[in-house]
Amino acid sequence: MIFTFKPMTQLHAEIISTWKYQEPYNFYDFETDAEIIDELLNGDYFCAFNDVEILIGYFCFGNSARVPGGYAAGIYEKEDMLDIGLGLEPSKTGKGLGRVFVKEGIDYLKQQLDIRKFRLVVASFNQRAIKVYVENGFVQKGKFLSKVNGTDIEFICMIKAN
């Protein structure tokens, strides 16, 4: 195992809230404010660390992983799976870590929550992430629009069951 996972802490929430991604991925940036810190500390987020205990990313699950436009599109009507979201530290993206990061995060959730079906949504332009999800057994189940900073962004719903 390359990564270890631990509950989100105040310190790590503050660090993650400062992460800034390069365009076009910068729409994944968090705002550094108390509301975001509270969100990261709501119990649905956990940190991922590398083998020398450096914070490398995070996972979230449940309502925290859902995109608002998905409700109107009906993708969250089926409750028999766990919604997940994730993020790698910006300097680690595009370096080939994604496949193992996603696999180990899902394995951790399976172990902790005894869940076997997962759902995630990803911006349709994020081909790097889509490739990683497909490599991890996710299949596309539909598309929908959701507003991000006042702009409609197309998202893809993907499911993994096993």
PLM regions and their residue ranges:
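A short beta-loop-alpha structural element at the N-terminal edge
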Residues: 2-15
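Residues at or immediately flanking beta-strands
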Residues: 2-4, 83, 117-119
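Conserved acyl-CoA
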Residues: 100-117
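C-terminal "cap" of GNAT-fold acetyltransferases
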Residues: 115-119, 123-127, 136, 143-162
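Acetyl-CoA-dependent GNAT
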Residues: 10, 22-91, 112, 161-162
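Conserved glycine-rich acetyl-CoA-binding loop
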Residues: 86-103, 124-131, 135
